[in-house]
Amino acid sequence: MFEEAMGAPVAVDLFCCEGGMSAGLRSAGFLVYGVDITYQPRYPFPFYQADALSFISYKASELRARCSLITASPPCQLYSKTHRINRSIYPDLIGPVRAALESLGIPYVIENVEDARTELRNPVTLCGAMFGIETYRHRLFETGNGLTLSQPMHPPHRARNAKMGRKAEPGEFMHIVGNFPGVDRARHIMGMPWASRNGLCEAVPVPYGMWIGNQAMSQIHGMEGK
């Protein structure tokens, strides 16, 4: 699986979608491989179409031997406000994914939305205002197997959010959700010029991934040196 690695630290991004987290990790110096149950033709790095839990199971030995970091973004619909409104049935994957990652022993990050806070262990919150991008986009990140993330200072939200479904005016922050207008601007904000509208809606902004990757890289070097 990792023939192209050639000594570079490897990260595997589960539930990768179109690769926002992956691109951030790549910018931090990892060689990244994406895994998603749905084919992702826009994903910009080596890609494996597979169920995440099955992938962990049948690639466990190879992952332990070669992988330095695993990130996972289980579907968030179960925890979203939309789910509470329409009562659709979605799988609860945070617990099973955590158990599988803990069994591997590889440093990991699990990402999800704010409404999943009670399901995550001591998560760090990231916001676009921390990175100077024009979307607030709060996301939570749990870490484990020796990896930790520091909680950045959370700046006040001074810019106004554009109303849902309306194009953001100059100085307004974007809601990158649903059938939003302004795909090109959203691509710029998220750092994903290759992404589709749906991919942007589901993505972790690239600056978040790079920040996580930089912290992980320094810690992983320390772990592997022991």
Language model region names:
Residues M6, S27-G29, R42-P44, R64-A65, ...:
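Short, well-ordered coil/turn elements that cap or connect secondary structure elements
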Residues E3-P9, V32, D184:
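N-terminal cationic amphipathic segment used for targeting or macromolecule association
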Residues D51-L69, C76-E224:
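Class I S-adenosyl-L-methionine
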Residues A11-Y58, T71:
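SAM cofactor-binding core of SAM-dependent methyltransferases
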Residues P9-V10, N86:
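A generic structural signal for short
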Residues M1-A8, I220-K226:
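Short intrinsically disordered terminal tails
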